[in-house]
């Protein structure tokens, strides 16, 4: 059974940092333009309350995945970040549970639209996002990596 919890204090951040590092290693791309060093030091600064959210998924009380919500400067727009599920836990519905919970968090915070970026080579992720109603969109910021796909989902009426 998947359990998804909101992370709101420092004591749970070690697990988040470990998962973020695993995500970055598996992605094997240089994301320094996203200030990942700062993010690893203080994830709650970027993804904390009241505008953001940081979620951990557990299976049998073991951390299995994570996802984050980031507030963007454009009014009513947030960004999905750092969706990651550990290799041994994939195919168990964890990513679905994380995305659903994050969408719910974003709606509760009053966001009208959620955006994300991913890489063309990450087809399972693109299919997951499409399953949850995300569609391709134009770039909302400059990502210098090759093969970037930008997606969005309307959450509330404009």
PLM regions and their residue ranges:
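Acetyl-CoA-dependent GNAT
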Residues: 6-81, 86-87, 99-101, 105, ...
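Conserved G/P- and acidic residue-centered "switch" motifs that form tight phosphate/ATP-binding loops
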Residues: 61, 93, 110
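Extreme N-terminal starter segment of soluble prokaryotic enzymes
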Residues: 1-3
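Active-site acidic-Proline motif in GNAT/NAT acetyltransferases
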Residues: 86-92, 120-121
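Loop/helix-junction capping segments adjacent to catalytic residues or to phosphate/diphosphate-binding pockets
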Residues: 10-13, 92, 123
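C-terminal "cap" of GNAT-fold acetyltransferases
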Residues: 112-115, 119-132, 136-158
């Amino acid at each position: 059974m998947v359990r998804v919890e909101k992370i709101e204090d420092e004591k749970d951040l070690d697990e988040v940092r470990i998962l973020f590092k695993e995500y970055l290693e598996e992605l094997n791309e240089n994301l320094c333009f996203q200030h990942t060093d700062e993010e690893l030091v203080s994830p709650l600064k970027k993804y904390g309350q009241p505008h953001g959210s940081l979620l951990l998924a557990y299976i049998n009380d073991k951390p299995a995945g994570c996802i984050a919500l980031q507030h963007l400067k454009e009014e009513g727009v947030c960004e999905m970040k750092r969706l990651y599920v550990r290799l041994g836990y994939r195919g168990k519905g964890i990513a679905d549970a994380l995305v659903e919970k994050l969408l719910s968090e974003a709606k509760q915070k009053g966001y009208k639209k959620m955006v994300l970026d991913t890489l063309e080579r990450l087809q399972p992720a693109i299919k997951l996002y499409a399953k949850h109603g995300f569609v391709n969109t134009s770039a909302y910021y400059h990502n210098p990596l090759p093969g970037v796909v930008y997606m969005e989902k309307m959450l509330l009426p404009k």
